Structure formats: C-alpha cells, structure tokens
A protein has these predicted regions:
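Extracytoplasmic substrate-binding proteins
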Residues: 87-167, 201, 252-321
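His/Asp/Glu-enriched short active-site or ligand-binding loop at hydrolase and phosphoryl-transfer sites
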Residues: 37, 175-198, 221, 247-254
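Active-site/pore-lining binding-face segments in mid-to-C-terminal subdomains
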Residues: 216-278
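Residues that mark the start of a beta-strand
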Residues: 6-11, 32, 97, 152-157, ...
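Short, structured coil segments at secondary-structure junctions
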Residues: 29, 94-95, 185-186, 246
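Pocket-lining segment of extracytoplasmic ligand-binding domains
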Residues: 177-178, 190-208, 213-227, 231, ...
Length: 322
C-alpha cells in the first residue's frame, strides 16, 4: 500500500485501455491521471467523452522507456500483469510504485477493484461498483440457471481479423473471459476442451467451424468494426451453407467506441446482450439501449444526453448487420 494517496498516476503497457477503464470507475481519483495512454483500439476513443480535458493531449507511449516514465514523475504506475516483466520490475526496483491488474475474469473485477479502491482511498466506491456488476450478473444467472444442459445451445464466439487478405478466425483460451461469456449466458462453448493453451488466441479454420456446427456464432473484433466482417461472411458462398447462417444466428457482438467482448469495464454489456439473444423468452423486457445508458450513468457518471446519443448511435451501427 502507498503511504499517501496517489497524485500523479500514469497507465502504461499493452492493453492499457483495460487499466484505464478500471481506474475511471473511481471519479474522485481521476484528477490524479497525468496523461492518458493510447485508448483507441481502432474504432474510436471513448475518452473524448469521459475525459475531454485529457483526451486531446499527449498520450503516454504504450511501451515507454524508463526515462520517459521517470520524466512524468509518477507516484503510481498502472499496467496489465503480463506487461510487468521488463518494465514494471525495473520501475519497482527504482522505488516507483507499480500496481498490476489482470481483470481477465468477472471475479477479477470484483477482487481487483476492491484493491484499487483501497489504493486510491475510495473503498466505498469499489463496493458500489462491484455491487452494480453483481446485480447485472445475478439477473442473467437467475434467468438461465434452470435451463437444462441438453437444451443449452452450442455457441462459437470467435474473433475475426484481416490484414489485406482472407479473414482470420481465432478463439480465446478456455480460461479467458470470452469463454465465460458463453457459459454464463447459458450457452455451451464449442471450442471448450479443444486443447488450446492459455497463451493467447488460437487460429481455427472454416472446416473446424463447420465440424463444430454451432447453433449460434458470435463474432467480434477490436481493431475493426465487427459488423463489417459479418457483412463479408454473409456474402461468402461457403458460409451460406453453415446452418447457423441459414437460421440468422451469425451475429456481430455489439460495442460503441470499443467492442464489448473484452475485459474492459463494459464487459457486462456483452454478457447481458448475449444472454438476451440466446434466450429472448427469458428476457422479455430486455432493452439493450436502456442498459447501455444506465451503465454509463451508473459506472462512469456519464448522463449528458448528447454524449449518450453518440454512444447509442455507435451501438446501433455495430448491430445493423445482425
């Protein structure tokens, strides 16, 4: 623990958007941020709405040098745990406090937000936020818990990407949040137990997808709009024979400035949307746009009508191909 509350905070390393999202759940600590890291994954920057006073300024390099960190005179450095070796350990050796986070699973958010709350002197806010997450999770769990195993749909949740060539399909390891999304939403992840190690996304082929024959296929992307890839799949003659495509059950997971299918603060919206899509009869009053607006107001204090309209407009574009 720090002797004093942090006054100069910087966030560094790959996936810095995860740590930034978490820190911004504590509004009374936001003024301590010296400058923002890179938070635009390729589809826009939410922080132009959340922190306009910092969003247009200089950004901390993703992998700064020791000298660049020291020049910013931080009394706290936040980073993802997998980026600690090689930079965080050197900063620690120099006496600069470093707080690493995982936030790869729902339970990580509860535990680590409590740690972060103590660090910034606002444990009450940590309890408030974890309770808000739990409330939304409980609604999903209570709705789908009685669905028998044999009645649960087979689901493929895959990341789609392209670099000036054919589309690439990948799935997350069994132990990552994407797998939990499907399980907690009441589905059966078709890739579970396929031998993919916890070392990152694993590439899969079209033939493997066809062999799995999932009832639902949900696609997502971080650097590009997932809906653009969905449009491409719908035009692909090979995909026309996939039963899920014939049934209209190949869909893009929504987002706004970022896709919801990742461990950012908005991960809960992915879980809510997926469960309502799998079981519309269990969520007859579900309104995704209402859930998005209440999320931003409750979790990030964003109630400005114009800002919320921009977020909803982005959400609508993300699902327009569904």
């Amino acid at each position: 623990m720090l002797r004093d509350l942090p006054r100069r905070v910087i966030i560094i390393g790959k996936s810095a958007i995860v740590a930034t999202d978490a820190f911004l759940l504590f509004p009374d600590a936001v003024d301590a941020i010296v400058e923002l890291p890179k938070t635009d994954q390729g589809t826009g920057d939410l922080y132009s709405l959340l922190l306009p006073q910092l969003a247009d300024g200089a950004r901390t390099p993703e992998i700064p040098s020791i000298e660049e960190v020291v020049a910013r005179n931080p009394d706290l450095v936040l980073m993802k745990d997998f980026t600690y070796t090689g930079l965080g350990d050197k900063l620690t050796a120099m006496g600069i406090p470093v707080f690493t986070i995982s936030l790869e699973m729902p339970e990580d958010w509860n535990a680590e937000l409590r740690q972060l709350g103590k660090l910034v002197g606002d444990p009450g806010r940590a309890e408030e936020v974890t309770a808000l997450y739990q409330e939304r999770q409980d609604k999903v769990e209570q709705a789908v818990s009685d669905v028998p195993e044999q009645d649960r749909p087979k689901v493929l949740m895959m990341r789609v990407s392209s670099t000036d060539g054919p589309l690439t399909y990948t799935v997350a390891p069994d132990t990552w949040m994407q797998t939990r999304f499907v399980e907690d939403a009441g589905g059966i992840p078709v890739w579970l137990g396929s031998g993919f190690k916890n070392k990152g996304f694993a590439k899969i082929s079209f033939e493997q997808i066809a062999a799995w024959n999932p009832d639902y296929i949900y696609i997502y992307s971080y650097k590009d709009p997932a809906e653009d890839f969905l449009t491409q799949l719908k035009k692909d003659k090979r995909w026309a024979d996939i039963p899920a495509m014939k049934a209209g059950r190949v869909k893009a997971i929504p987002g706004d400035f970022s896709n919801y299918a990742q461990p950012i603060s908005r991960w809960i919206l992915c879980l809510q949307w997926m469960s309502a899509d799998l079981y519309p009869q269990l969520f007859p009053d579900f309104d995704m746009e209402r859930e998005i607006c209440s999320f931003y107001e409750d979790f990030h204090g964003l109630s400005d009508p114009q800002a919320q309209r921009e977020i909803i407009d982005r959400y609508r574009r993300s699902v327009q191909a569904n």
